[in-house]
């Protein structure tokens, strides 16, 4: 991480020439590249420098002298301060175009390839979509006030938010109620964060606390839970310390196209955008072109988000996941949904796997990969040994997707099609999906 030293005050007058993938304007000044927050291509701005190194500088736009025609008024009154969003000054269409251009650029630059066709970008609602988030909490003693929000941009401070426009409204519209609740606790200065998940069947909120809650504190939380129709979970240490304050709530999301209901725990990884997740899974199933003779392997399968819908059409599916708890819940969800042609195994896919039962002597003609941001270079190299000829790759990092694409091409695969999944509207985060075929 770069160390940020104190800078002499410097103000620029800049013409913004283009846009970076993370949502900053790009300008040039005295042979240096300047990355400018809150500035759009075509704008003339006054900007204050915030960072400097040999190759580039960073700045914040303080005055827009000539706004771009496509500049939008942000919906949120803390946009530009809060680090949660970076694209609220752009329309949904412009956001998609920027993300699509970035994906194309990364493919061309790193993998020296372009897909034979481009998929239409997947998108749904732009606001109130986010069903899982971690927000910071800070008690300000001088004001006797609790702040709840995402971290400020380029800062560890908590944004003072009364509402959040991207969070699902069942929580996003009630941050003040939560703040008022925490202000009444005896340990309000020892609560650094909460994590919330808004499922289709209930809401769970995990409250991290560094001191023990009193009986009175628990009563305050119980009253707040009743008011907001949520279930509080407390967390005094690691993940194994998470426990419900009262009766646990059953958390679910559905794949209605496949008659599947998924149950999960509040600490489990799930996609934050349920509606777009349904679209993404349907697209993946479509791209796999499944039939009753297919044997499919789903790598980094998690709860079985893709595995179980795939099993509705394939002969047999194997899901591989490194987290034992997720493997156990994937098995539970398969049984609960009466899906019998699937097996799940625990394996660390970043380590040697050739000796495992699901690998040794086994073949699969189709595969799905949905790795973390670090990508799947280790497992990609093994796909030919498994007999895979058709692969759907779901990515949350275009850079590692492009790196793995280069390896797949060397292994004889062709990049048939790819496109953007706008899982996180109003942010610069780029999810994508790609189809590879080995002839």
From Swiss-Prot:
[4Fe-4S] cluster binds at residues 76, 82, 85, 164. The keyword GTP-binding does not apply. Its EC number is 2.1.1.190. CDD domains: AdoMet_MTases. GO terms for molecular function: 4 iron, 4 sulfur cluster binding; iron ion binding; RNA binding; rRNA (uridine-C5-)-methyltransferase activity. It comes from the Bacteria. Pfam families: TRAM, tRNA_U5-meth_tr. It is an enzyme of class 2 (transferase). The active site is at 396 (nucleophile). The lineage of its organism: Bacteria, Pseudomonadati, Pseudomonadota, Gammaproteobacteria, Candidatus Pseudothioglobaceae. The gene is rlmD. GO terms for biological process: rRNA base methylation. S-adenosyl-L-methionine binds at residues 271, 300, 305, 321, 348, 370. SUPFAM superfamilies: Nucleic acid-binding proteins (SSF50249), S-adenosyl-L-methionine-dependent methyltransferases (SSF53335). It catalyses: uridine(1939) in 23S rRNA + S-adenosyl-L-methionine = 5-methyluridine(1939) in 23S rRNA + S-adenosyl-L-homocysteine + H(+). PANTHER family: 23S RRNA (URACIL(1939)-C(5))-METHYLTRANSFERASE RLMD (PTHR11061:SF49), RNA M5U METHYLTRANSFERASE (PTHR11061). Residues 5-63 form the TRAM domain. Keywords: 4Fe-4S, Iron, Iron-sulfur, Metal-binding, Methyltransferase, rRNA processing, S-adenosyl-L-methionine, Transferase. Belongs to the class I-like SAM-binding methyltransferase superfamily. RNA M5U methyltransferase family. RlmD subfamily. This is 23S rRNA (uracil(1939)-C(5))-methyltransferase RlmD. Catalyzes the formation of 5-methyl-uridine at position 1939 (m5U1939) in 23S rRNA.
